[in-house]
A protein has these predicted regions:
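Radical SAM/AdoMet-radical enzyme domain recognition
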Residues: 78-99, 105-240
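Short, basic/aromatic recognition patches
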Residues: 288-298
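Flexible mid-to-C-terminal extensions adjoining Fe-S/redox cofactors in radical SAM and related proteins
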Residues: 2-4, 10, 320-425
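Conserved alpha-helical substructure of the radical SAM core
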Residues: 2-147
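Short, acidic, Ser/Thr-enriched surface-loop or helix-capping motifs
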Residues: 309-310
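Short, small/polar residue-rich loop motifs at catalytic or cofactor-binding pockets
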Residues: 300-304
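C-terminal accessory region of radical SAM enzymes
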Residues: 237-287, 314-364, 369-370
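Short beta-strand segments
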Residues: 51, 190-191, 217-220, 262-265, ...
Length: 425
């Protein structure tokens, strides 16, 4: 997850010190002012994406869970879900994301949210927004959801409805967004980058401004579930889309709009941003590289900083990796499954850099990127450690002296050409 509005636009957001170790205004803070975070995979705790129902009232063309408006067997009961929340709270996970299917379809949605609140868990919900009326928005606000992420595929109602498989979905989703805004609930958009979305980016950013939306996350497509039937962006299309998002994000900040813009699920976005800032002579280029390296870079992602529990209680490295299961919460707590490295893939995810192959193995950014999204690589090639085909960096851009991710308390040297090396001595 790349916070474009912070790194490129210079926005100060509440999450900035936690994600990047410092406020954007701190050029080189002393060690005692930097955020203290675990520096090893074993000590990390994951954000847990919990697909606690597969049932959905829509049928989206890019749905990674292949959900439909039917009841599915084997989903966790209310008591089982509460036991999972108890374990996650004791384990110290930084956040739990209620997802689906459509999570608000579960009859016990609010009961589980209230239980999570009692445990002081940081809870987010990912929803299509069609079930959020004014009363639901007020209840969500009352239960102190940190954030409501609502899926949108286009600013054009016809295109959105076609993607969602239901006429009128756009208007119902927009009503849900407006109800959240009206009650003061933090709300944002979740958009998957497809050819339709990319051609619609100017209109989407106009909608963000017009509707006073707090946040927008642009997800690179992972071809899981029904998403495998969609054409992925070419590398040139990806670069154009990311450039457009960078530019629009900076413009929002310059005009005084405090909107968080993030890109998700392609970790080469970070190196690409730094290369662009370096090329443009941006005064914060060095600072941004340090911030990207903070917290171990993106190599601490799936299987370390991100985890997944599906509708039946199976545990996966992330929500796109349901083809591989490490255990089930009905048999063992998530905390035990997550720390068990007897499975070679789980062990590898926690120390992945030596296992990467192909262009990832020789890439100078691998300590920042971590080989990007392993699920996309494995779906495309059948090999866990193969290069991610979503990487749009050129061979020339990834060649050169490796960039070294140092501890947050260390200041590494910078080569004249912008490459970094570990401090000597």
């Amino acid at each position: 997850m790349l916070d474009v509005s912070v790194l490129y636009g210079g926005l100060e957001a509440p999450s900035t010190p936690h994600r990047y170790g410092r406020a954007i205004t701190q050029i080189d803070p002393p060690p005692h002012q930097r955020m203290a975070v675990a520096k090893s995979a074993a000590a990390r705790r994951p954000i847990v994406v919990w697909n606690f129902t597969r049932t959905c009232n829509l049928r989206c063309v890019h749905c990674y869970t292949d959900s439909q408006a039917v009841a599915y067997d084997g989903e966790l009961t209310t008591d089982e879900c509460k036991a999972v929340l108890d374990d996650l709270a004791e384990f110290g996970v930084p956040a739990v994301l209620f997802s689906g299917g459509e999570p608000m379809i579960r009859p016990d949605f609010y009961e589980l949210a209230e239980h999570a609140r009692g445990l002081r868990l940081h809870v987010v919900v990912s929803t299509n927004g069609t079930l959020i009326d004014r009363a639901a928005a007020e209840r969500i606000k009352e239960l102190k959801f940190a954030y409501v992420g609502i899926s949108l595929d286009s600013a054009d109602p016809g295109v959105h409805d076609e993607f969602r498989g239901m006429g009128g979905a756009f208007e119902r989703t927009m009503r849900g967004i407006r109800h959240c805004v009206a009650v003061g609930q933090k709300v944002g958009l979740r958009l998957t980058l497809t050819p339709h979305t990319c051609s619609d980016l100017p209109a989407i950013f106009e909608l963000i401004e017009r509707e006073s939306i707090d946040r927008a996350c642009f997800y690179h497509l992972c071809p899981a579930g029904r998403g495998q039937d969609l054409a992925a962006l070419s590398h040139a299309e990806s670069r154009r889309a990311i450039d457009a998002i960078f530019d629009a994000s900076a413009k929002l900040v310059q005009t005084g709009r405090r909107v968080e813009i993030l890109t998700v699920d392609n970790h080469c976005d970070g190196p690409y941003l730094w290369l662009r800032m370096l090329r443009d002579g941006h005064p914060r280029a060095r600072q941004v590289l340090d911030m990207l390296a903070f917290n171990g870079g993106a190599r601490f992602s799936s299987g370390v900083g991100i985890g997944n529990i599906d509708f039946n209680g199976d545990v996966h490295a992330d929500q796109f990796s349901m083809f591989r299961t490490f255990g089930n919460v009905r048999e063992r707590p998530f905390s035990q499954i997550w720390q068990d490295t007897s499975d070679p893939v789980m062990a590898g995810l926690k120390d992945r850099l030596p296992l990467l192959t192909g262009r990832c193995a020789s890439c100078r950014f691998k300590s920042l990127c971590g080989g990007s999204l392993r699920a996309r690589a494995e779906i495309a090639t059948g090999q866990t450690w193969a290069p991610d085909p979503g990487c749009y960096l050129t061979d020339e851009e990834i060649a050169g002296e490796p960039i070294v991710v140092a501890e947050a308390s260390a200041v590494s040297a910078e080569e004249p050409n912008g490459n970094r090396r570990a401090p000597s001595g």
